[in-house]
């Protein structure tokens, strides 16, 4: 399948290039940028020398449709709202890494993103691309809304509990921490080295834009779902997300039952690895890979469950899951081109 990448010079776009250039069935036919048209990609990213000969092109749908079958949009929020309808009308399939098509309700998008929403016509076409839980829908989709990085880790961690109504819906607390690449390529004060190094920032407390897409999925799994408490932190590493979920158990359950629940639910999910009871993952153990590692603990004294999930925010949290979804759209094995061993140490 021939693919194009729009927004190729951001961190998500560069990770897509790395994965797709090594993919056995996808071929990159063009890469596109808003600000660096005419430049060679290696002028910004010298590590790609010898691997790529692409020059960044302007975004012209007519030209793209002559070469590509599928387009990856690695653009900021508010951009794909305008581009996606044009691409779909041109007969192209789209994997959108932004948040523009994740929400079913346009007013909720506008409330959280402070931008005009896409039309309901196209929002209804979009399939939320949480690969492990939406495989069948993704295979039929023309437009896949790739989930946010925090949302991916959170939803994979909480899905077995919510779907089986094991926890009290009003007791969910999520403590999420991300490496600085999650803040994007554009420099910010919080991501400035003297501010970030040897420090820890909390930001967007209960205001992060991934909250509504998490709650949207929770309601779909359990109609009794309530708003969640969700905090995000910036940590001084380049890649990685750790989500720690706390919730009160509805009735007494043995930890072995909880562990078996996760193991059975994810037994056919290649990229979800459940740790043995009492063992919890670290972000370095998934770095550079498409894996989500999950550890489960239960405090009988407080009747609370603790679930820890880690992902690489650039892989399972962005480009890796986008390629996984593209594999599904192309009716390939979803593991194709993604079986990278994590980089360690």
UniProtKB/Swiss-Prot annotation:
Q: What is the annotated role of this protein in its UniProt record?
A: Catalyzes the NADPH-dependent reduction of N-acetyl-5-glutamyl phosphate to yield N-acetyl-L-glutamate 5-semialdehyde.
Q: Where in the cell is it found?
A: Cytoplasm
Pathway connected to this protein? Amino-acid biosynthesis; L-arginine biosynthesis; N(2)-acetyl-L-ornithine from L-glutamate: step 3/4
Keywords for this protein: Amino-acid biosynthesis, Arginine biosynthesis, Cytoplasm, NADP, Oxidoreductase
GO BP, sorted A to Z: L-arginine biosynthetic process
Q: What EC number(s) is this enzyme filed under?
A: 1.2.1.38
Q: Name one GO molecular function term.
A: N-acetyl-gamma-glutamyl-phosphate reductase activity
Q: What is this protein called?
A: N-acetyl-gamma-glutamyl-phosphate reductase
Q: Which Pfam families match?
A: Semialdhyde_dh, Semialdhyde_dhC_1
According to UniProt, the reaction catalysed is: N-acetyl-L-glutamate 5-semialdehyde + phosphate + NADP(+) = N-acetyl-L-glutamyl 5-phosphate + NADPH + H(+)
Major place of localization?
A: cytoplasm
Q: What class of enzyme is it?
A: oxidoreductase
Question: What superkingdom heads the lineage?
Answer: Bacteria
Q: Where is the active site?
A: 149
Instruction: Fetch the SUPFAM superfamilies from UniProt.
Output: Glyceraldehyde-3-phosphate dehydrogenase-like, C-terminal domain, NAD(P)-binding Rossmann-fold domains
Q: Which organism is it from?
A: Bacillus cytotoxicus (strain DSM 22905 / CIP 110041 / 391-98 / NVH 391-98)
Q: Name one GO cellular component term.
A: cytoplasm
HAMAP family, sorted: ArgC_type1 (MF_00150)
The family annotation for this protein states:
Belongs to the NAGSA dehydrogenase family. Type 1 subfamily.
């Amino acid at each position: 399948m021939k693919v194009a990448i729009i927004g190729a010079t951001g961190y998500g776009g560069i990770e897509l290039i790395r994965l797709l250039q090594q993919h056995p069935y996808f071929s990159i036919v063009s890469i596109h940028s808003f600000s660096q048209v005419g430049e060679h990609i290696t002028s910004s990213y010298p590590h790609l020398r010898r691997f790529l000969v692409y020059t960044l092109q302007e975004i012209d749908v007519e030209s793209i449709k002559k070469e590509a079958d599928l387009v990856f949009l690695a653009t900021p929020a508010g951009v794909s709202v305008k581009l996606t309808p044009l691409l779909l009308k041109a007969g192209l399939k789209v994997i959108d890494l932004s948040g523009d098509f994740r929400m079913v309700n346009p007013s909720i998008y506008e409330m959280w993103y402070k931008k005009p929403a896409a039309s309901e016509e196209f929002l209804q076409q979009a399939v939320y691309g949480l690969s492990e839980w939406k495989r069948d829908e993704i295979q039929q989709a023309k437009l896949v809304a790739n989930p946010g990085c925090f949302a991916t880790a959170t939803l994979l961690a909480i899905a077995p509990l919510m779907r089986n109504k094991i926890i009290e819906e009003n007791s969910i607390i999520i403590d999420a921490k991300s490496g600085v690449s999650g803040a994007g390529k554009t420099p910010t004060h919080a991501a400035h080295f003297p501010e970030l190094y040897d420090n820890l920032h909390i930001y967007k407390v209960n205001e992060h834009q991934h909250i509504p897409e998490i709650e949207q999925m929770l309601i779909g799994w359990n109609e009794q779902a309530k708003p969640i408490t969700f905090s995000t932190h910036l940590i001084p590493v380049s890649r990685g997300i750790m989500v720690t979920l706390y919730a009160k158990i509805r009735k007494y359950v043995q930890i072995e039952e909880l562990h078996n629940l996760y193991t059975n639910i994810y037994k056919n999910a290649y990229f979800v690895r459940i740790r043995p009871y009492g063992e919890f993952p670290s972000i370095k153990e998934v770095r550079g890979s498409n894996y989500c590692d999950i550890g489960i603990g239960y405090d009988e004294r407080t009747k609370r469950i603790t679930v820890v999930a880690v992902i690489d925010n650039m892989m399972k949290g962005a480009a890796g899951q986008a390629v996984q979804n593209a594999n599904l759209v192309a009716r390939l094995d979803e593991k194709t081109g993604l079986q990278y061993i994590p980089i360690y140490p």
